[in-house]
Amino acid sequence: MPRDLTSQDSVRQDSVAQDSVHRDRVIAGRYRLAGPLGGGSEANVQKAFDLHSGDAVAVKIFRCSDAANEAPFRREVDIHGRLRHKNIVRVLGSGTTGHQEGGEIRNFLVMELVEGMDLRTLLHHQPASPRETAEWVSGIARALTYIHRRGIVHNDIKPGNILVNLAADPGGPGVAQLTDFGIALTGGTATPGSSSGTPHYLSPEEVRGENSTTASDVYSLGLVALECLTGTKAFPGPPLESMVARTLGEPRIPGTVRRRWSMVLHAMTDPDPAGRPSASQVVGMFRRLSR
């Protein structure tokens, strides 16, 4: 049965409401803003209407155009903008807003509007069922397979960067779609200490300041899968405490998790990157789990 998603607390308006980008404002002469969808430290996301096509879209507006925000924006344009996959939120365009209040000029991305919620919000309501977990995690694993074959490491796999498109799967679990490539890496690996992903989902090697690789994405997805089933972070607590725990052992998998699932989760969160399955192997593992 599809879960009840009538609650509207998925819209995180606290930081967005303070932003100088207002509802009904038209940016770049084309996109009429229609209200906040969410936001983070670097950008806020607004629902908008494309006045040229009439389509509803999502516009990600970066908070300022200084050097600190220019790099994530360029990565989104150069990396995310060229990706085309069912399980990746599609970038439709980009630009600058022109002069804002206070004379600021802001970069923005135009993306497909996903009718649903981010995974963090869904798990706040209740843990996912095994069926939902298998569907969502295998979808993101397919997205990772696609980007890894192109030499891209997402570098920030977490529930907040996974959107569940409910409209694309009426009556079903929904289609999981990966978003936010602001700290993605190209070339397959990064220089040591380069990871700036979310502390609670970093791999042990990233915590130690080692290379971020495709195996690091798989580890983070393993933590997401475990959180789907339990409703709680695998390594809770303050960020530093959580990261230290990562280097001391594997995540604890409750006895309530079925043995077949436990084996897959242990493989994905192997402390040794070389011991983890590839993203394409994860797809096969979850296909077998869902039978």
Task: Label every model-predicted segment.
Residues 217:
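Conserved catalytic-loop aspartate of Hanks-type protein kinases
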Residues 101-118, 122:
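Conserved short submotifs of the Hanks-type protein kinase catalytic core
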Residues 63-82:
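AlphaC helix of the eukaryotic protein kinase fold
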Residues 94:
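Activation-segment/catalytic-loop signature of the eukaryotic protein kinase fold
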Residues 34-40, 45:
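Protein kinase glycine-rich loop
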Residues 136-137:
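Activation segment signature within eukaryotic-like protein kinase domains
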Residues 142-152:
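Protein kinase catalytic-loop region centered on the HRD/HxD motif
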